[in-house]
A protein has these predicted regions:
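A SIS-like phosphosugar-recognition module
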Residues: 1-192
Length: 192
């Protein structure tokens, strides 16, 4: 049993066979964003190491994935700048939100669930994260004019965009958060 932790002296670390220090130090605030990001990065690196060791990834694939991780890390400062500007533009709407709902699909379901956790911890209003299809099978019925919806996508997705367009008249605001560069007034395009 191995533990990924920011505290190699923690009770879980002491009870494990092996410890991987994620090297973030102990975060002094109640919401641990740095730890989440470092944990995801370490899990990706572990998966790559295991795949390489088991012959499921060749040296070229390993180099490709490592280059992609470096590219993403290099894009973080620009993503922070774009996000800050987006929040500034929509600060009144975001401040007035009484409930936040994040929608993701595929690997982005985890991001939607983490959004649920972080918004609940920091904004301290009810927040939920849903898988796109699951949201369409009932939870959408609770939407009202005080809700803010966040549609998270890595690539443009017809179903996500159709649901966003369908929900927009029923909620305070529907935003799209995308890795692409197609920004409009209600889309945060991280371009990475």
């Amino acid at each position: 049993v191995f533990a990924l932790t920011s505290d190699p002296q923690s009770p879980i670390a002491k009870a494990c066979d092996g410890v991987l220090d994620i090297n973030t130090g102990i975060e002094s605030v109640g919401f641990v964003t740095r730890g989440f990001s470092a944990t995801v990065l370490n899990l990706l690196l572990m998966a790559l190491l295991i795949a390489r060791g088991q012959g499921k990834a060749c040296a070229d694939e390993e180099r490709h994935y490592l280059a992609e991780l470096r590219r993403l890390a290099a894009a973080i400062p620009a993503a922070i700048t774009r996000t800050s500007r987006f929040i500034d533009r929509h600060s009144a709407t975001l401040r007035d939100g009484e409930r936040f709902v994040a929608i993701g699909y595929g690997a982005l379901v985890g991001v939607a669930k983490e959004c649920e956790t972080k918004f609940t911890e920091t904004v301290r209003v009810p927040s939920s994260g849903f898988e796109l299809e699951a949201y369409m099978h009932g939870p959408y019925l609770e939407a009202n004019a005080r809700h803010i919806m966040l549609f998270i996508e890595d690539q443009p997705d017809e179903r996500s965009r159709a649901l966003r367009d369908y929900m927009t008249p029923s909620v305070a605001q529907a935003f799209t958060l995308t890795l692409n560069d197609g920004e409009d007034a209600h889309t945060l395009a991280l371009n990475c």
